[in-house]
Amino acid sequence: MTPPASAPRVITVVGPTAAGKSDLGVFLAQRLGGEVINADSMQLYRGMDIGTAKLTLPEREGVPHRLLDIWDVTETASVAEYQRLARREIDRLLAEGRTPILVGGSGLYVKGAIDALEFPGTDPEVRARLEAELAERGSGVLHERLAAADPDAARSILASNGRRIVRALEVIEITGKPFTANLPGDEPVYDAVQIGVDVERPELDERIARRVDRMWDAGLVDEVRALEAAGLREGLTASRALGYQQILAVLAGECTEDDARAETVRATKRFARRQDSWFRRDARVVWLGGGHRDRGELPHRALTLVERAVTA
């Protein structure tokens, strides 16, 4: 399904963590008279500020940022709910003649917003049974079952990610189809200009390490401690966020703070690689250099790309 030529434009700024997406989103919104719509699943949570690198109010430079701080840390993330909220914001901006700019590295959230993606329903009885089995037998056993039922899904879901494994098995049982059959293709709902920010791996790894250091120095441990008191540990999604999961382990006496800091760096580097792989599978994403040699030119190259697409 291809939108008609007159379909309004949506811009996405995607790529791995620490690539420089947020600043580029602010620049484009200022130049195009638009607003930023958050597409980072963990920035949806209230109070998760330091560890998600959420822009402060001064850093937003007056640009409205939508879909930040909308969920409590005890709530489980829902791509279907995000899709509803994001499309509402997109449609509002388009109706006002303004430019929606989705910014974030949560690939499924971006696709859910701009592509034709329908979510299978849920069955509380099936979900409860699978979650009980997860608690009793562990994610490894369920991952083996998923591998037998849908090898492609098993390859794309970490064996340690019990929540996603349970969801995949639930969908298979409800629909009678492989979980991957329900994953999004590239059928657009909106005519989108998709910009990927590309940073070479050695430089990106250095940025990630420095960012984690800044987060610790800015008080991430205290932020997690306060969120723990607000129910973070019980949140199935928020408690797994990078940095937060590791510090919760410190607060539980399971590791040292130095160990948690080092593991946060390692886990974030692995996560950045998975993000990069996800977005590179989408041929519609145009990649622009965001490394130190290109950083000064990135905003103007992105603006030129958008302007050419709009006038094409």
UniProtKB/Swiss-Prot annotation:
UniProt-listed HAMAP family? IPP_trans (MF_00185)
Entry binding sites for substrate: 17-22
What is the protein's quaternary organization? Monomer.
Sequence similarity: Belongs to the IPP transferase family.
| Enzyme Commission number, as recorded | 2.5.1.75
List the GO biological process terms: tRNA modification
Which amino acid positions bind ATP, per UniProt? 15-22
> What function does this protein fulfil?
Catalyzes the transfer of a dimethylallyl group onto the adenine at position 37 in tRNAs that read codons beginning with uridine, leading to the formation of N6-(dimethylallyl)adenosine (i(6)A).
Region feature (Interaction with substrate tRNA): 40-43
Where along the sequence does the record put site: Interaction with substrate tRNA? 106, 127
Q: What gene makes this protein?
A: miaA
Q: Which domain of life is it from?
A: Bacteria
Q: Which PANTHER family match?
A: TRNA DIMETHYLALLYLTRANSFERASE (PTHR11088:SF60)
Q: What class of enzyme is it?
A: transferase
The cofactors required by this protein are: Mg(2+)
Q: What is this protein called?
A: tRNA dimethylallyltransferase
Listed under catalytic activity are: adenosine(37) in tRNA + dimethylallyl diphosphate = N(6)-dimethylallyladenosine(37) in tRNA + diphosphate
The protein's GO terms of the molecular function aspect are:
ATP binding; tRNA dimethylallyltransferase activity
> Would the keyword Nuclease be found if you checked this record's keyword annotation?
no
Keywords in alphabetical order, please. Answer: ATP-binding, Magnesium, Nucleotide-binding, Transferase, tRNA processing
